[in-house]
A protein has these predicted regions:
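Repeated loop/turn-to-beta-strand initiation elements of outer-membrane beta-barrel proteins
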Residues: 26, 72-76, 144-147, 196-199, ...
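Membrane-embedded beta-strand positions of outer-membrane beta-barrel proteins
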Residues: 30-32, 78, 149, 189, ...
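Transmembrane beta-strands of outer-membrane beta-barrel pores
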Residues: 34-40, 82-86, 142-144, 151-155, ...
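Residues that define the transmembrane beta-barrel architecture of outer-membrane proteins
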Residues: 54-60, 129-134, 141, 181-185, ...
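Residues on the lipid-exposed face of transmembrane beta-strands in outer-membrane beta-barrel proteins
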Residues: 62-68, 135-141, 187-191, 223-227, ...
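Outer membrane beta-barrel
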Residues: 67, 74-198, 204, 390
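Detector for outer-membrane/organellar transmembrane beta-barrel domains
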Residues: 258-261, 265-357
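Outer-membrane beta-barrel "beta-signal"
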Residues: 380, 385-387, 405-422
Length: 422
């Protein structure tokens, strides 16, 4: 079935992109990205016992894009991906039964999606090469109605770093490359009013992991209303997501030159009501003829550990948190977080971005520094490091494993990514 779905996607492509001779030509594009990284783990880290420290990894990401517009209002989109990983982290992740691509290149499994459009080309202990279809959709865009069916993406919410309202393949807050979200098989609609407000609806069917059958308990149906009044924009959301009922709202407005954003999400599951909240302020200014923007964001995760006990034994009892982490919806273990960041224009071609992610409950933090340099047109270099801060027993210092004196601790990492866009 897996290979049949993949081949079906390939064979459907010519039909979707083939149009009458009078139509415009296909718009092609894409990128090739190569990343080299090295991660150093402490001696008491569980990763040190199953992998070389420092761990050296290489990743390859090739994406070919095709988009077709014909007449008005039809369009079609296709993205092909070739993904490769080679290195010590893959060996360690397999030894610890952790998905390597969840750690390095984002979610790639199509196990629960309606169509399995991912196929492994080759695989060994320290390497894997696979290809997949990440976008394959047909769209209609009228004056007041928009519809799209197929593999596509949706991004919602006002969170700039933490995104509780964006539960369709959100980015890890500490991800260094946020160019492309992973696509989902969905049906999307949007109704636009004369005043500029809109109502969006998304249906994402998913399969049961065990049986492979499409199930309503694994699927999502979401509606979001967006409107603007004076200088304030607001959102209202209602969803059935897996077996949860979700209600939410968000605001965004200008205040004395800064932009204030916030989202509040309530999840009703197993007779429990759980809240999530994010609020941020961002401000831009010029200093010494350099453009600078700053960001401060608070995040509350009601699914996180309330008592600050992040041991493996304690986490296994928090099934709601672990389920959302395994689905790629949550990336934190605690409840209260503060992120502070800035974007500094060193030169028009060089951007420096320092960010500090802090767990307010245990005081641990993750420091990230990114340097983005445009070498020339279509060529880009992204380099930097991440440094966990905190004592053992904390989220970023290292959570206790089941082995006494051994911790699941993140390592300090150096990385460089070279990108070519075409």
């Amino acid at each position: 079935m897996k290979h049949l779905d993949y081949l079906t996607g390939i064979f459907l492509l010519p039909g979707i992109l083939t149009v009458p001779a009078s139509a415009e030509s296909i718009i092609w594009g894409g990128h090739t990205k190569y990343q080299l990284s090295q991660t150093r783990y402490d001696d008491d880290s569980l990763f040190s016992s199953v992998a070389t420290s420092p761990a050296t990894d290489q990743t390859l990401d090739f994406r070919l894009k095709a988009q077709k517009y014909w007449g008005s209002p039809w369009d079609a989109t296709f993205h092909y991906q070739l993904l490769g990983l080679h290195g010590d982290t893959l060996v360690a992740s397999r030894s610890l039964a952790v998905s390597p691509f969840r750690l390095n290149t984002g979610a790639i499994s199509d196990q629960q999606r309606l169509f399995d459009l991912t196929s492994v080309i080759s695989e060994r202990d320290d390497r894997i090469l696979l290809h997949r279809i990440d976008r394959l959709s047909l769209g209609y865009s009228g004056e007041q109605f928009v519809a799209r069916a197929g593999r596509h993406i949706v991004s919602w919410g006002n969170g700039l770093i933490y995104s509780p309202m964006d539960f369709f393949n959100p980015f890890d807050p500490a991800a260094i490359d946020k160019s492309y979200k992973t696509g989902d098989d969905m049906f999307y609609t949007q109704w636009l009013t004369q005043r500029g407000n809109d109502l969006q609806g998304v249906l994402v069917p998913r399969r049961e992991p065990a049986s492979g059958n499409v199930s309503s308990d694994q699927s999502s149906l979401v509606f979001k209303y967006h409107a603007a009044a004076d200088l304030t924009e607001y959102d209202l959301l209602a969803a059935r997501h897996y077996d949860d009922s979700i209600m939410g709202g968000g605001l965004a407005f200008d205040w004395r030159g800064s932009v204030i954003r916030s989202d509040l999400i309530s999840t009703y599951s197993d007779r429990d009501l759980t809240m999530a909240f994010v609020a941020s302020t961002s401000y831009a200014w010029s200093w010494l003829n350099r453009n600078i923007s700053g960001l401060l964001e608070y995040y509350y995760n009601g699914f996180g550990q309330a008592d600050g006990d992040y041991s493996v034994a304690a986490l296994t009892t928090n099934t709601a948190l672990l389920a959302r982490i395994s689905r790629g919806e949550l990336f934190t273990l605690g409840r209260n977080y503060l992120a502070a960041g800035a974007t500094i224009e060193i030169t028009p071609l060089t951007i420096l971005t320092p960010t500090l992610f802090t767990n307010l409950d245990d005081g641990s933090a993750l420091l990230q520094l990114l340097l983005n340099y445009d070498i020339k047109q279509d060529f880009n270099l992204l380099a930097g490091f991440t440094l966990p801060i905190g004592p053992t027993g904390t989220e970023y210092g290292g959570i206790p494993s089941r082995i006494p004196g051994i911790f699941l601790s993140p390592g300090s990492a150096l990385f460089a990514k070279l990108s070519w866009h075409f």
